[in-house]
Amino acid sequence: MNLKPLSDRVIVKPAAAEEKTKGGLYIPDTGKEKPQYGEVVAVGAGKIADNGQLLEMQVKVGSKVLYGKYSGTEVSVEGEDYLIMRESDIFAILG
């Protein structure tokens, strides 16, 4: 992947959608929920504060993150799906 996010944006590779229920039933494509977690694959330099100081990003490449259902912009690069979102759209870092 050859994407470099700008400012306080991050690129997240969403987790794969569940294929089966816990009971073993297969979920059709129309019934699958979008995953709300994934792995950060690229981060921008950070946000510029009002005083001109660069604020470092709290997430790093490789972080597993939890985000909102409608967070980010979906993009497809080289056949892979990603989300581009602001760091503030991320709710938590997992584990």
From Swiss-Prot:
One of its GO terms (molecular function) is protein folding chaperone. Signal peptide: none annotated. GO terms for cellular component: cytoplasm. It comes from the Bacteria. GO terms for biological process: chaperone cofactor-dependent protein refolding. It is found in: Cytoplasm. Keywords: Chaperone, Cytoplasm. The keyword Iron-sulfur does not apply. Its main location: cytoplasm. InterPro entries: Chaperonin_GroES (IPR020818), Chaperonin_GroES_sf (IPR037124), Chaprnonin_Cpn10_CS (IPR018369), GroES-like_sf (IPR011032). Together with the chaperonin GroEL, plays an essential role in assisting protein folding. The GroEL-GroES system forms a nano-cage that allows encapsulation of the non-native substrate proteins and provides a physical environment optimized to promote and accelerate protein folding. GroES binds to the apical surface of the GroEL ring, thereby capping the opening of the GroEL channel. NCBIfam families: PRK00364.1-2 (NF001527), PRK00364.2-2 (NF001531), PRK00364.2-4 (NF001533), PRK00364.2-5 (NF001534). Heptamer of 7 subunits arranged in a ring. Interacts with the chaperonin GroEL. Belongs to the GroES chaperonin family. This is Co-chaperonin GroES. It comes from Pelodictyon phaeoclathratiforme (strain DSM 5477 / BU-1). The gene is groES.
